[in-house]
């Protein structure tokens, strides 16, 4: 199989689809890998590293897309849509429930798109989303602490406080991978941390994990309102695989927050959980202020720490990439049900229910679309 690794073009997206070690594994399995010039430089992997791993370095973006399978990090941008072709396998993060134009382009060009975030194991965990959720969760507490500083628009709060001065209050909505990792860093910074989740069993697990050092609260509209309005930092970390994020924090709740408080919407690439995060921001211009509250809505947070993120992502995605390359997508889906759940579009059909519902499009199951 011929595989392409394009350079990411999203604002300040410095990750790359595969590290040189991942490329080497594919080449050793008998596949041809084309890597776009400087694709890995943002993660401090040079072209020579890929060449030594067995890749062919190509300068033309069109050439790196003219392959059997493209492995990326983030969803393609509009300038990349012309490279779509029937039968192309696209393996990347897609978050299509918040991307109607991209979804339509994939359907129109009959692309076989496999989204990292909807690959799901029997225990409902997301093995290809998990490493980036860990990174984004940990970053969210660090970023929140930074933007609470007065010089960054915040109210001038030190999360850990000092003797005689209260700690900063951090509320995390969602107790999954991202929320749990946000709590770890917030606790490490000395904050007073509360996690809200809808699953009592998960709250029990979090209580055990943190030894009672965080407040674990059932998530419902009244509790969300109560804790949001008294918080200095609110982190949104709710995920429904493949579907749009629920808008759990209303504009009225935001209006009740203190001036200079901060919200971090980790779920912004799925639409966000705050009614007031009405636009996606970038690493170049990461925040805006609405109702006196600092809003951080960067959709590719892990892109700011690309070396760590690329290596962690490569560890997770490589076994699936090898499966797709070695077996072909049909046999790979037959033999690996979690991978088949990653299929979002197939030759003109939407094969993810959450995406179909988001845009009122016709849905076909993977089995029906592929006639497995």
UniProtKB/Swiss-Prot annotation:
Q: In which pathway does it act?
A: Amino-acid degradation; L-alanine degradation via dehydrogenase pathway; NH(3) and pyruvate from L-alanine: step 1/1
Q: Where is the active site?
A: 95
Q: Name one Pfam family in it.
A: AlaDh_PNT_C
**What is this enzyme's catalytic activity, as reactions?**
L-alanine + NAD(+) + H2O = pyruvate + NH4(+) + NADH + H(+)
| Xref: CDD domains | L-AlaDH (cd05305)
Q: GO cellular-component terms in the record?
A: plasma membrane
Quote one Gene Ontology molecular function term: alanine dehydrogenase activity
Report the PROSITE patterns cross-referenced here: ALADH_PNT_1, ALADH_PNT_2
Q: Which keywords label this protein? A: NAD, Oxidoreductase
Supply the EC number(s): 1.4.1.1
For binding NAD(+), which residues are annotated in this chain's numbering? 169-199
Q: Which GO terms describe its biological process?
A: L-alanine catabolic process
Against InterPro entries, the record matches this protein to: Ala_DH (IPR008141), Ala_DH/PNT_CS2 (IPR008143), AlaDH/PNT_CS1 (IPR008142), AlaDH/PNT_N (IPR007886), AlaDH/PNT_NAD(H)-bd (IPR007698), NAD(P)-bd_dom_sf (IPR036291)
Which family is it part of? Belongs to the AlaDH/PNT family.
Describe the function of this protein: May play a role in cell wall synthesis as L-alanine is an important constituent of the peptidoglycan layer.
What this protein is called in its record is Alanine dehydrogenase 2
Taxonomic source organism = Staphylococcus aureus (strain N315)
Q: Which gene encodes it?
A: ald2
